[in-house]
Amino acid sequence: MAVVVSIDAGTTGVRSFALDETGQQLALSYQEFTQHYPNPGWVEHDPTEIWNAVKFTLSELNDRINEPIAAIGITNQRETVVAWDRKTGEPLCNAIVWQDLRTSDRCEQLLELGHLDQIRQTTGLLLNPYFTATKIEWLLHNNVVENNSNLAFGTIDSWLLWKLTDGSSYATDVSNASRTLLYDIKENHWSSEICELFGIPESALPEVLPSSGRFGTTSATTAIGAGIPVSGIAGDQQSALFGQACLEPGMTKNTYGTGSFVLMNAGSECPDPAEGLLTTVAWDLGNGPTYALEGSIFVTGAAIQWLRDGLGVISHASEISDLAASVPDNGGVFFVPAFAGLGSPWWDTRARGTIIGITGGTQRGHLARAVVEAIAFQTRDVVEAMSRAAGTPIGEMRVDGGASVMDLLLQIQANQLGVRVARPIITETTAQGAAMLAGLAEGVWSETGEIHSAWRLDKAFDPQSDRKAYDTEHERWLQALDRSRFWVD
């Protein structure tokens, strides 16, 4: 039996995942790591703690499967940047996380200086603190790291690849590179002009390789043993698109995680920039890039965590579905979870969270339902922008991620979108996608048709009939969203 392992280094923890050649999950191990908030709007991770979580989960997984491992894939939270010393292999500071807002003013300055069009046309992205470039610039400008020949920057995948191979491989894949704000997605290389704009030396950036192919082999110091090929890498959302078998243009998925990320396969031609959306590289199987349109929603699952940890409305995240279903509607309450501003399609870093419509009759259930509905409303906003850009509505949305277990959410989502929402049997599609990219490179699967065959439906949610009522709810949501915008000076 061929076994492929995937390391999924997310925003709040690491999952290591094993599957066989039929695409069936064999084992899963998970380890959380600490979130650091040193200043308002700042979010950091300890790279060593992430690496230790990887070692722990790989060791636990290895004990469970007792089979030789054919390949390893890596998928990761994107945009988050690690700086380390190539000589010692040690991090130079905490990683700056994708949610971090410390470079908001710098992004505003670059907008005022007229750099948006150059950035947009070259990278497919926007000037926003979400992306990696201004984080690296901040580290250099504030002398947190010293610019010398030993300096290495990388997204989480590069850091883990370095550690897995004991420093013999310093690389990333094209999907992660395309999220840095430094990569020319049409010419497929680091942009010298953009690197110069941010004062970032190209020598401190990793080699960019296809998403499926040999990146290196594990060293004897890893918890899983030496000589195992690391043969697939993709950013978490692109990996989920692949794991959902969205391999044809127009196929669309949404991952409900800390945030939610809607991606549509755009084919082999790089699409023009679309209002409110990002153009990104989905993957490269060795024959050139496949592109995607993306809508990035910053806060969805994190809002459920806030109900639990911030307000104490629920004790466990799993309670929210029953609590939201305990009331027939939201009671006029709308919640805009703009904790870190708004992402697609609004891109407003000055927006802040808003709860509106509270009365003396508002109950815990109404607040819970407003949180669940906010996930669906934000997704609808992105999908409508995506349909306008593509010139055609989507036909189906495939879903995954932690909140996809909530039938109530998926039914509300189908009602708001007016299309079928399909949940697969395996909802760990982020990890599954990276494993499949690695397995393709090592011959576990010989063609993408086998990836299609591995996707299996668990449950479909078709839209219910009251379209006018759903549109009215969405219009009220947009009114609430407007109240949240441009709050911070």
Predicted regions and their residues:
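Gly-rich Lys/Arg/Thr-decorated short loops/hinges at beta-loop-alpha junctions or inter-strand turns
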Residues: 33-44, 118-121, 171-178, 359-366
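Glycine/Thr-rich phosphate-binding loops that ligate phosphate moieties of nucleotide
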Residues: 1-30, 37, 70-113, 169, ...
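Gly/Ser/Thr-rich active-site cleft segment
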Residues: 9-11, 22, 119-237, 292, ...
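Conserved glycosyltransferase catalytic-site signature
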Residues: 77, 133-136, 157-158, 234-239, ...
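A polyampholytic, Gly/Pro-enriched intrinsically disordered region
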Residues: 112-128, 226-233, 251-253, 440-454
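ATP-dependent carbohydrate kinase catalytic cores
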Residues: 175-288, 292, 298-302, 315-324, ...
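Phosphate/pyrophosphate-binding loops at sites that engage ATP/ADP/AMP, CoA/4′-phosphopantetheine
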Residues: 54-70, 142-148, 163, 192-202, ...
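N-terminal phosphate-binding loop and adjacent alpha-helix
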Residues: 29-67
